[in-house]
């Protein structure tokens, strides 16, 4: 048993200690960047999914795939898993979600009264934990872990997610793949896979792809296998394989009358920091002696690190910022230091809000690519590569995506009353170096070095070091003049 547990631990964590696989050299030889919009939309009964082409050079350089899902009222996104770790940012709305970790106990139990139908009574339903989410939440989904999501309110849920296809835990190719557990819908990245293979694929192969389009993972098994595996009749098997699906159901279905599952109450924003304590509360685990309460200390190592870990953290506008300037804006980050689940993903995220005409000074990320998604408003953004060439100089508007490769320098200036963005980063502990302002690279250089490096006079070198007292966010010049006056 000890060897089995040890092997399972090694399987879960083996890819996490290695360094991130480097992208192909030519994929990051970028002379020009563009703000990208989604180019594919798949409609479903309860909403729709939009995707960006992962074959585009910037996505290939970053080794990620991006999608955006919109859930209407009472919409359920069917369970699925992917070939790489995911980060999901809730741009809008509230709801519930669940993840299924193989080997973890089902610690949630539905109330007995909800299971009654007339005089008959069914066994109580037990399942793994259901979590609530709200706007601004960052959700961590490890590789191969199945998850589902449901909108129980009137406001549509908009969720933006990345899949890290360059992760060492992805042992397939770099094409993102989503494996649905149910339904008969189109896999949102299949179109791009077919485009990539189109040149070498025979007509017969194309026909096979079309026939397989819209199948869930169970549909490929022989019905007799599933009948025996689940112990059910053939009618149920046909449903499991998606044969009785409405044509327009898709990956997002509408639950008539609403979904009734047990979920914890939504915690107030100021209680978010106490989530770790909530995860350590004793849980009810079914044994041959009935319901046994177990504390975190009494469970095995896998339970402590996987089954009870916190899966979401709020980094939106209602969270406590890491950097705040009342005239310029705020920045909030989530790394594995404060959100340990990100250690499994080797990913992190940053939320930023810039007031009109405020600037995020030129800076670069030392150890990660950045996938910047504009949540609201617009900003003028400039990106510079290693040759000193401006590879992007334009507006990034709401719904647009800009990929900034590792070590490329970037600066942004808000053009609207409030520019908001979320930046996904391909490292769980990213380091950012600012090129101007307090604590910047130039600020840390000796004055004499600056003077002779840039051919400046002593007073000019002093101005370069000390004229900007702000670290990352610079207020509009008019507000600085008012403050001086």
From Swiss-Prot:
Compositionally biased residues, Acidic residues: 272-281
Disulfide bonds: 28-61, 104-307
Protein name: Glycinin G2
Every Cupin type-1 domain range: 33-238, 313-462
Molecular-function GO term, any one: nutrient reservoir activity
Function: Glycinin is the major seed storage protein of soybean. Glycinin basic peptides (GBPs), and, to a lower extent, glycinin exhibit antibacterial activity against Gram-negative and Gram-positive bacteria (e.g. L.monocytogenes, B.subtilis, E.coli and S.enteritidis) by forming pores and aggregating in transmembranes, leading to membrane permeability and, eventually, cell death.
Alphabetic keyword roster: Allergen, Disulfide bond, Endoplasmic reticulum, Seed storage protein, Signal, Storage protein, Vacuole
Biased segments, Low complexity type: 192-205
Sections of the chain in a coiled coil: none
Gene name as annotated: GY2
Keyword Endoplasmic reticulum assigned: yes
Uses: Emulsification efficiency of glycinin is improved by degree-dependent glycation with soy soluble polysaccharide (SSPS) at 60 degrees Celsius in both the acidic (A) and basic (B) polypeptides as a result of subunit dissociation at the quaternary level. Thermal treatment of soybean seed proteins leads to the aggregation of glycinin acidic and basic polypeptides (GAP and GBP, respectively). GBP improve sensory properties of meat (e.g. pork) during chilled storage and inhibit bacterial growth (e.g. L.monocytogenes, B.subtilis, E.coli and S.enteritidis).
Signal peptide: 1-18
GO cellular component terms, semicolon-separated: endoplasmic reticulum; protein storage vacuole
Motif (Vacuolar targeting signal): 476-485
